[in-house]
A protein has these predicted regions:
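Catalytic pocket-lining loop regions of alpha/beta-barrel enzymes
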Residues: 1-79
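Mid-to-C-terminal alpha-helical segments outside catalytic/metal-binding sites
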Residues: 72-79, 89-121
Length: 121
């Protein structure tokens, strides 16, 4: 989990230190890697062995910033997340589709990346 109200324990900088100690560790960082600390997710986590999910992010972040994170980190390291039961799957999917990614990018984020990560694709 990343970027909670108590940022001290879920800040991107802290996760980066863990990744420095365990470079082969693969991590999924919720909320595009930072929730309320998206600039730090770009600064400390982009390009690392981290997958970001989209849960509880797209309603709170503007399209330009979310696209910057997705494109800079790489669509192959982004996972769709709804944060159900907090938000409905349908609403989160609609928010995601409004980003305007290509069909190929959508397929990766909506399932193929997770399948590859979990070893089923």
């Amino acid at each position: 989990h990343m970027g909670d109200e108590n940022l001290e324990f879920s800040e991107p900088k802290r996760l980066a230190k863990i990744l420095d100690k365990f470079p082969d560790l693969t991590v999924i960082a919720a909320h595009l890697g930072g929730y309320s600390a998206w600039d730090d997710s770009v600064k400390y986590l982009v390009g690392r062995n981290v997958y970001f999910d989209t849960s509880s992010s797209l309603m709170f972040i503007d399209k330009e910033k979310s696209m910057k994170i997705i494109k800079t980190h790489g669509v192959e390291k982004i996972l769709f997340g709804s944060d159900y039961p907090m938000w409905s799957h349908k609403d989160e999917l609609q928010r995601f589709l409004k980003l305007g990614l290509t069909n190929e990018e959508n397929e990766l984020i909506l399932g193929k990346n997770a399948s590859r990560l979990l070893g089923t694709y």
